[in-house]
Amino acid sequence: MTLKDIPFWRVLLIFQTARVYAGFGDPREAITMIHQQHGKPCDCAGGYVNAAPTVYLAAVSCSSHTAYQPSDSLKWRCVSNPTLANGENIGNCPCKTFKESVHSSCYTAYQECFFGNKTYYTAILASNRAPTIGTSNVPTVLGNTHNLLSAGCTGNVGQPICWNPKAPVHISDGGGPQDKAREIAVQKRLEEIHKSLFPELRYHPLALPKARGKEKIDAQTFNLLTATYSLLNKSNPNLANECWLCLPSGNPIPLAIPSNDSFLGSNLSCPIIPPLLVQPLEFMNLINASCFYSPFQNNSFDVDVGLVEFANCSTTLNISHSLCAPNSSVFVCGNNKAYTYLPSNWTGTCVLATLLPDIDIVPGDAPVPVPAIDHYLHRARRAVQFIPLLVGLGITTAVSTGTAGLGYSITQYTKLSRQLISDVQAISSTIQDLQDQVDSLAEVVLQNRRGLDLLTAEQGGICLALQEKCCFYANKSGIVRDKIKRLQEDLEKRRKEIIDNPFWTGLHGLLPYLLPLLGPLFCLLLLITFGPLIFNKIITFVKQQIDAIQAKPIQVHYHRLEQEDNGGVYLRVS
């Protein structure tokens, strides 16, 4: 049978047939919706809580806090890490026994103390917690050397507890001071290796960002934005037609997605950077996750990078030598720290990942809160809906099927990852400089009583400040540098028109503040003017009704009873 022999209506029916998924819709769209609504781990969409959840699926360190994904919710909940209390040294330790490690969820603040010429940590115990084996609070089978031992805390609640400042190998205190000390030790060791390999000491942007003027954007930041937009334009041109690319202020935490690159680079030309904090995503959804494991030798030369607690390692490769990540990838290890190089004496568990910048997208047709006359009318501003970069690129629907499922060439993602590895710290300083300008402008805003949300500089606008993010406008031609400047000019034009209008400048500039009160005042005036008249009308009407009821005669209807004389005999007694 040929195509000509098939009736036309059958061919039309075949092309009109839609794909169904057992009546539940496309599961990839559900994954995209979950990421868009619940955000990234460090966004803390589930809010901050006082204690870590009893059972959680994954934990991600976010510098000042730790994000947990509980089993009863898809939103990440965050717990602030303990801080060093005021008066960091209290002298002699108030304890007679000292523990090896104490989990950070068991106290809120800690101090240093001394005992026997040694330094220890001490805190007031707030709760008890049993130590666990595994990647979460759910214990796994003992004997698995790849599992992470999470420290516990036992004692009398409300009493002081003391412990060593250095934790044993492969034991985590949940982002507390012991984990911080481990990270500092690893960073110092990598810096020593870097100095031995490069005696002339070439400063990496991660270690020393370039100096630049406060009013100018750094070249690395602009190049990263351009590369991100180019990738977005090729993978999702409809979204990239007109949009805002928003970078968070402060220290950026790049996104880490699984990488299937099995080729490891040569150690001779391996770039060495300090540990980089990242946000691992999609590792829990990955079916076949390959991990690298190096056992510890139980000596002082071990470089403990920790064990991953955000991935299900289905395959574990035992490593006994140094490792160099491919040019566009990193090793993500314990406390979600990323490394490009692992020395020969490293110990822990790591996964290979590709980095993407922590950029959110605002569609061009979405209203952004640019201040204008709305400020004077005191209109409530609508919240800006940000689209995560992974959703915009379509990565959330493809990672679970492997890199072959990515819509665009994987080489483009690796190029962006390679550039991000080199420039992330320079970008951090740039956005921090811009945030400093926003903070300094806040005082001007309060003094001039104007809602100035646009970031201004001597040479023109840089970015639009939206919810602690620095947003850059882009269209078909790429990143538009003068977009904010044009918005500022339009805004200034509107303000001049308002200032020149005597209606707004009356009463020595107090009229804009009196306008919100005009409505209630007008209603009150109407009530005072017409209120008594309406009240008298109501009283008169009620009185008339009562008088009418009282004046109306009461009619009683009755019938006269009939009398019958039967002519009976009566006995009369005298």
UniProtKB/Swiss-Prot annotation:
Keyword terms: Cleavage on pair of basic residues, Coiled coil, Disulfide bond, Fusion of virus membrane with host cell membrane, Fusion of virus membrane with host membrane, Glycoprotein, Host cell membrane, Host membrane, Host-virus interaction, Membrane, Signal, Transmembrane, Transmembrane helix, Viral attachment to host cell, Viral envelope protein, Viral penetration into host cytoplasm, Virion, Virus entry into host cell
Ranges for region Immunosuppression: 446-462
Entry keyword Transmembrane helix: yes
Ranges facing Extracellular side: 23-514
Motif (YXXL motif): 558-561
Extent of motif CX6CC: 463-471
Keyword Cell wall biogenesis/degradation: no
Disulfide bridge partners, by residue number: C243-C246, C243-C471, C463-C470
Signal peptide: 1-22
Domain-related comment: The YXXL motif is involved in determining the exact site of viral release at the surface of infected mononuclear cells and promotes endocytosis. The 17 amino acids long immunosuppressive region is present in many retroviral envelope proteins. Synthetic peptides derived from this relatively conserved sequence inhibit immune function in vitro and in vivo.
Subunit comment: The mature envelope protein (Env) consists of a trimer of SU-TM heterodimers attached by a labile interchain disulfide bond.
Name of the molecule in the record: Envelope glycoprotein
Organism of origin: Simian retrovirus SRV-2
Gene: env
